[in-house]
Amino acid sequence: MRPPLLLFDIDGTLVNAGGAGRRALEEAMEHHLGDTVRREEAWLAGLKLDGMTDRLIVREAMMGVGHPFDEGLCGRILDTYADFLERQIRGPGYRVLPGVEPLLAELAARRSTVGLCTGNILRGARIKLARGGLDRHFGFAEGDVYGFASDGEARELIVAAALRRASARLGRKVDPREALVIGDTPRDIAAARAVGCPVLAVATGRFDVAALKAEGADFVVPTLEEQHVAALLLG
């Protein structure tokens, strides 16, 4: 039986942004905090960004250079980040990952309930998906199904927010076991597990099949173009 609700991560799962997000965020931090450290020091050096939320990345980066975290400043940095991302995303390194386009098209044709469950801020998510023409498959407005960085720094809060919005849209409480989270990192797996959702992990990010299996994903595939992925998601 196909899952009633499918929640997709973005980076490493649907698209590879070619480093656009990192470049844009470093630009934004330099713009707002350029007098804090020497420019040759990378703002995000040492941070393992895979699966981190945008807000948590900013917090960790600020603390890493000895700058006290400030909620208002974090918001301004992320607004500027989205401005810079509009330009950076046009770089040549961007690509839609294997199997994504036909899978989303088939899910749309079958009227499957899909949503986003990502550490991106809303605007950043839309920019990254729009570059590959994938934004049309997801909703970003009130009443749509999504979880973004604005819902919390911890990814499990984002999964929980997506489930709440799905419940509101469907007019009934969605049990976490009815949803399938699709992601590419151990953080995706841990967040889904914390909320009680099963997980399909795809090895199109930085983690291979063996690593994702070791993290306890319910299903692990090399790419979303695998034939049994369609069978699992489409029933």
Residue map of PLM features:
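Active-site neighborhood of HAD-like aspartate-dependent phosphohydrolases
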Residues: 1-45, 50, 59, 63-64, ...
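Non-catalytic pre-domain segments flanking phosphatase-related domains
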Residues: 1-8, 60, 69-72, 178, ...
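Helix-loop "lid/cap" segments that line or gate small-molecule binding pockets
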Residues: 26, 55-69, 128, 162-165
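Metal-dependent phosphoesterase signature
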Residues: 62-102, 110
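Substrate-recognition "cap/lid" segment bordering the active-site pocket of phosphatases
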Residues: 92-95, 121-180, 186-195
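Conserved phosphate-coupling serine/threonine residues in phosphotransfer and NTP-handling enzymes
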Residues: 118
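Short acidic-hydrophobic, aromatic-tinged amphipathic segments that line or gate anion-handling sites
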Residues: 147, 219-224
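Acidic, Mg2+-coordinating phosphoryl-transfer loop and its flanking beta/alpha structural elements
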Residues: 181-219
